[in-house]
Amino acid sequence: MSMKRDRGFSLLELLIVVAIILIIATIAIPSLLRSRQAAQESSAVANVRTINTAEVTYLSSNQGAYGSIPELITAGLIDNRFTGSVSGYTFTVTASGTTYTANASPTSTNAGRYGYFALPDAVVRWATTTSATCSPCFPTGQSGNGVQ
C-alpha cells in the first residue's frame, strides 16, 4: 500500500492570497481612476485648443464672423465627434459675430474636476465644476484661471 500525497492549497493559503489581492486592488484602483480623470482633462484642454484653431480659420474665411460647432463641422474644420461626448466632456460653442466662447463641461463628476473654456484671445481657462453639468463654472468675460 502506498501513501497518497495530497496536493493543492489549503483554505488558509487561498484566503491569504485573496486578502493580498484585495489590498493591492484597494491601493491601485483610486490611482488608476485619478490617472484616467487627468487624461480626460488633458484631452478636454487639447480639444478646446482645436476649437480655437478652427474658430480662427473660420473667422478668416467668413467675413469676420465666428461659427458654432455645426458651422465648423460643415466647413470641415473639426470632425463631427464634437456633437456628442468626447473623452468624458461635452463641448459647446456660443458664437455671436465677433466673439465666441468655447466650453468643455464634464459629463459627470468622475469625468473631470474642472470645466474649461476659451474666448477669442485663445487662452484656455479652467473653472472648478460645482455640478455634473458645470453650468455655473463658466464666468462671463475674461475671468478664470489660465491653463499652462
Residues of each region from the PLM?
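Extended, polar beta-sheet/loop recognition surfaces of beta-rich domains
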Residues: M3, E41, P70-E71
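N-terminal single-pass transmembrane signal-anchor helix
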Residues: K4-L32
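Nucleotide phosphate-binding site architecture
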Residues: P30-L33, L59, R125
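Aliphatic-rich helix starts adjacent to a transmembrane/signal segment
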Residues: S31-V48
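Extracellular/periplasmic head regions of type IV pilus-like filament subunits
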Residues: T53-V123, S143-Q148
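A short, surface-exposed interaction/processing loop segment used at functional sites
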Residues: A118-Q142
